[in-house]
Amino acid sequence: MKLDRQILKLAHHEAHHHLMSDLNYTMELHRFMKDVIDLDTYLSSDFGFKKFLNDYGVGRTLKAGDDPKLKILSLIKDFQFGKSHVQEIAILATKIQQQGLSSQSGKGGPGLPQSFCSKFLYVLKPDQLIPYDSYVLKSLQLTYGLPLKTLDEYYEKADHFRLRYFSEKSDEVIKIREKK
């Protein structure tokens, strides 16, 4: 029982740390999107674009240097966001790739930066989107015993998993609440 409390306390601390960090990235991004801060400021601020790329581990998917990053931020600022986040990820990733702003893939051409786009859109709309992540992808493939080849498949299985294990009425959430 004592170990459960220690684990829960550590998990709470980690969750709080990451949520506060995510919240700071979200606030800074919204300040940029609303023209409260300019492009250069957002690029280099404490919770700005360069730090986001590093902390979220997606900087390697984009072309090196400030110029491509500034072009990506301009592209994002002009991007028309709709209601289908999965489609937005694919469309934005394709635009970045087509403009030659992503890094080279293992196949020799510019890569498709889906992970970057999903994490960026997550920071923009944290209440509406979960990020596309290779570790989550592998976990979902193990959980469901099948390869997930498209963003649609990934998000369908991720949402199913979320609703199964983390909905307010799931058995797991009820068990956790009963232990308090």
Segments (PLM) and residue ranges:
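Terminal substrate-recognition subdomain of acyl/acetyltransferases
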Residues: V123
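An N-terminal alpha-helical hairpin/helix-loop-helix interaction module that forms a charged
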Residues: M1-G108, P126-K180
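Cytochrome P450 catalytic-core helices
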Residues: C117-F120
